[in-house]
Amino acid sequence: MEWRAVSRDKALDMLSTALNCRFDDEGLRISAVSECLRSVLYQYSISETEEARQTVTSLRLTSAVRRKLVPLWPDIADIDNAIHPGIMSILNSLAELGDMIKLEGGNWLTAPPHAVRIDNKMAVFFGGEPSCTFSTGVVAKSAGRVRLVEEKVCTGSVEIWDANEWIGAPAEGNEEWSSRLLSGTISGFIDAPSNMSETTAYVRGKWLHLSELSFNKKQIYLCRMSVDNHFSYYLGEIEAGRLCRMNSLESSDDVRRLRFFLDTKDNCPLKIRIKISNGLARLRLTRRLPRRETKVLLLGWRESGFENEHSGITHHVFPEEILPIVRSAFEGLGIIWINEFTRRNEI
C-alpha cells in the first residue's frame, strides 16, 4: 500500500464523501463527530467473551473521537459552546435524540435501531450500528447529528415512528392540554398576599404592569414577578389593576407551553420565517420552546446571531429534508410557519 500526504481541504473532501455528507464547515464537523461517536461506541461495546453489548464510559468515547479527529480539527478539544458544541455536548445531544442510551455513572450503550418518518420517502435513522456497517443497498446520508435513509429500507426491519410520536408533545394537542392546566390551576386559587405589586401580566405576547391593563373587570391572566433574579410564574385573578387571587405554576416548561396557547387564543401567534437556500433552511427563534419540542432543534445546528442581539434570540440551520419534522413540532404549538423560498416562487 502506498501512503501519500494530502492537504486538510482534500482530507475534508474525502471525509465528506465517506460520510455521504453534502455540508461543509460546522455541518460537516458535527456530522463527523456524531458518526465517529457511533462507530467508537459500536467498536468498544463488542465483547470477545460475552454476547451482550458492554457499556462504554464517556471518557473513553470522547478521548477516542478526539484522537481520531484532531488532525482535521486541531482545536477540537477546546471547542464547546452553543454555536460550536464540543464532543461531550454532541454525545449528550445524541442521547436526547434517542440515538444512544445514557446510563448512570457516565456509561453508554447503543440504542435499538428505529426511524422517524419524514415524508413518504425519507426517514431519520436512530440507534443501531454506524453507517459503515449497513448492508449493501442501504444508503445513509450524514446530516449533522442524524442520518437520513429511504423509508423503504426501514419497513419491516426497524420500528418506524411518526414525527409527533417521536416529539412526544401532549397527544391531546396544546389547546386541550392548556385548557386542563388552566382549569386545574384556577380551582386552587387562594387570596393573593399584599406584597405582589410588582406583578406583570401576559397580554398578547407582552408582559404588562397591572397599571397598564385596560380592563377593570375581573379577569384571569398568566402573571410573573421577579424574585431573587428569577421569575416566579402564577395564574392571577386581577380586578381594577389589583391581584386578588392566585395559584402558582411550578413548571417553567408548562409556562412556555401555555404561552404559545395564549398567543394563539389572542390571535397573535409567534411567526417563524424559514429561508431556504442551497438545501439548507435557516430560521430565527425569538422564544424558547417547551422541552419536548426543543429536541427538534438538534436535528440541525446553531449559527451566530447579530451583534448586540438579545441573548434569548437563537439562529438555527437545518437540512431541508428534515423540515417536515421541525414544522410538525412548531405547528403543534400554534407557531405560524412562513416559507420565504415558497413565497418568492409564488410571486
From Swiss-Prot:
GO cellular component: cytoplasm
Disulfide bridge partners, by residue number: none
Disruption phenotype: When this gene is missing the Druantia system does not confer resistance to SECphi27 in E.coli.
Compartment(s): Cytoplasm
Main location: cytoplasm
One BP term from GO: defense response to virus
Keyword presence, Cytoplasm: yes
Protein name (Swiss-Prot/TrEMBL): Druantia protein DruD
Species for this entry: Escherichia coli (strain UMEA 4076-1)
